């Protein structure tokens, strides 16, 4: 091999290595990214079953149903739409109706419901996950109180008017 051929072989090998590394990084990120949706977003842009997402909103009043073992089903709402959620596991201590929640999982094509593998609840009376709070503010379903921020009463009950008292 001449010097020119050696140089081209080294450059070609280096470029191949860089392309392979970039493709591996893109593949790894593609597997771990979970986009955030509110229930109303899912009505506008349906998600393919098996696609991993984060679903946020409020736990609808009267929707928590305990099943066999540690299985719990409940409904997540943003005041406009509702999504049934099924979760098997131990729920956070602060999980309850009318409170903010972010679930992560996938849609099940057979049941047409959301199957969560993790559930996050707000950790005190003044906290709501930023994504959920921003979306509720955009929809007019957020009330700011003297004691701190809280979801509007109509949002937890699924009232579509968004009116606060």
From Swiss-Prot:
The entry's protein name is: Cytochrome c-type biogenesis protein CcmE
Q: Where does heme bind?
A: 123, 127
InterPro entries, sorted:
CcmE, CcmE-like_sf, NA-bd_OB-fold
* GO-annotated biological processes: cytochrome complex assembly
- Annotated membrane-spanning segments are 8-28
Under HAMAP family, the record lists: CcmE
Query: What Gene3D superfamilies does the record point to?
Result: Nucleic acid-binding proteins
Gene from which the chain derives: ccmE
Keyword list, A-Z: Cell inner membrane, Cell membrane, Cytochrome c-type biogenesis, Heme, Iron, Membrane, Metal-binding, Signal-anchor, Transmembrane, Transmembrane helix
Cytoplasmic topological segments? 1-7
| Region described as Disordered: spans on this chain | 138-165
Q: Where is this protein chiefly located? A: membrane
UniProt-listed Pfam families: CcmE
Instruction: Please list the residue ranges that the record marks as compositionally biased, kind Low complexity.
Output: 145-158
GO MF assignments: heme binding; metal ion binding
Q: Which domain of life is it from?
A: Bacteria
Q: Which SUPFAM superfamilies match?
A: Heme chaperone CcmE
Residue ranges that the UniProt entry lists as topological domain Periplasmic: 29-165
Q: What does this protein do?
A: Heme chaperone required for the biogenesis of c-type cytochromes. Transiently binds heme delivered by CcmC and transfers the heme to apo-cytochromes in a process facilitated by CcmF and CcmH.
Q: What is the lineage of its organism?
A: Bacteria, Pseudomonadati, Pseudomonadota, Alphaproteobacteria, Hyphomicrobiales
Q: How does it sit in the membrane?
A: Single-pass type II membrane protein
């Amino acid at each position: 091999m001449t010097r020119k051929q050696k140089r081209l072989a080294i450059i070609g090998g280096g470029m191949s290595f860089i392309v392979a590394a970039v493709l591996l990084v893109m593949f790894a990120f593609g597997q771990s990214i979970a986009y955030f949706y509110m229930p109303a977003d899912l009505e506008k842009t349906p998600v393919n079953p098996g696609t991993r997402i984060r679903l946020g909103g409020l736990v609808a009043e009267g929707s928590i149903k305990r099943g066999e073992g540690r299985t719990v089903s409940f409904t997540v709402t943003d005041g406009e739409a509702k999504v049934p959620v099924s979760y098997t596991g131990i729920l956070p201590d602060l999980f309850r109706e009318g409170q903010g929640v972010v679930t992560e999982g996938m849609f099940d094509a057979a049941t047409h419901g959301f199957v969560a593998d993790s559930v996050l609840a707000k950790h005190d009376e003044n906290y709501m996950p930023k994504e959920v709070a921003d979306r509720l503010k955009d929809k007019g379903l957020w009330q700011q109180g003297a004691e701190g921020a809280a979801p509007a009463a109509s949002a937890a009950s699924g009232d579509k008017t968004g009116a606060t008292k």
